[in-house]
Amino acid sequence: MSSKYIVIEGLEGAGKTTARNLVVETLKSLGVTDMTFTREPGGTVLAEKLRSLVLDIKSVGDEVITDNAEVLLFYAARVQLVETVIKPALARGEWVIGDRHDLSTQAYQGGGRGIDRQLLATLRQAVLGDFAPDLTLYLDVDPRIGLERARARGELDRIEQESLDFFNRTRARYLELAAADPRIITIDACQPLEAVSHDIRATVTRWVQEQQ
C-alpha cells in the first residue's frame, strides 16, 4: 500500500495525543511500520521557532500579534514542515501521522478569529496547492470540557487562553468543514475513553482496509 498522510485535529483537551497513540497502534497491527510523526505549528527547527513566537504569550513581550500576522506565521511554519519533512517522508514510502494541519487554521483563524474565508483560501492555495491529508480524524469535544482538561494539564498557551466564545466559534467551523469533506471523519470525544478508543481503532481499520 502506498504511503498516506493522516492528521488528528480537535480543540484543546480533545485527546489528540491519546488518539495519535491509538492510530499508531492500529496501523502497526495492520502491518504499517514506517511512520513519521509531525506537529503543527512546529516539526522543524525553523517551524519550532515560529511555534514559540505564535503560542508563547511572553515571546513578544507587550506587543500584540495581529490576527493577520498570526495566520501568516502559521502558514510559514506549515510550508516549511510540508516541504522539508512531510513530502520527503511520503516520497520515501513512509506514513505520516500529524498533530494538526491546515484544518486547524481554517477553524481557529477562520472560525475563532473570523478571518475572511477568501483570504484563507488564497493563502492555502499559495502555500499548499492541492496537497492535503488522505484522512483527518476530528475529535469533537464540548469547549467547556476541553478547556477544563487543558487547564488540568498546566499553564495555557496564548491561544488556549482565548474566551469560551472563541472556542465555540472554532468548534462550529470544525463541524461545518468536517460535514463538507468526506476525508474528514468526526469522532465524538465527549464519550468515555473506552468508547473513543473503540471508534478510533474501528475508523482507522476500516479506512485502511478500504485503501487496499
Curated annotation (Swiss-Prot):
Matching SUPFAM superfamilies: P-loop containing nucleoside triphosphate hydrolases
Catalytic reaction(s) noted: dTMP + ATP = dTDP + ADP
Residue ranges crossing the lipid bilayer per the database entry: none
GO cellular component: cytosol
Domain of life of the source: Bacteria
Coiled coil location: none
Alphabetized GO MF terms: ATP binding; dTMP kinase activity
Amino-acid positions noted as binding ATP in the UniProt annotation, renumbered to this chain: 10-17
Any single biological process term in GO: dUDP biosynthetic process
Gene3D superfamilies in alphabetical order: P-loop containing nucleotide triphosphate hydrolases (3.40.50.300)
InterPro entries: P-loop_NTPase (IPR027417), Thymidylate_kin-like_dom (IPR039430), Thymidylate_kin_CS (IPR018095), Thymidylate_kinase (IPR018094)
Top-tier EC class: transferase
Pfam families: Thymidylate_kin (PF02223)
Alphabetically ordered keywords of this record: ATP-binding, Kinase, Nucleotide biosynthesis, Nucleotide-binding, Transferase
HAMAP family: Thymidylate_kinase
PANTHER family: THYMIDYLATE KINASE, UMP-CMP KINASE 2, MITOCHONDRIAL
Purpose of the protein: Phosphorylation of dTMP to form dTDP in both de novo and salvage pathways of dTTP synthesis.
Protein name: Thymidylate kinase
Species classification: Bacteria, Pseudomonadati, Pseudomonadota, Gammaproteobacteria, Enterobacterales
Gene symbol of the encoding locus: tmk
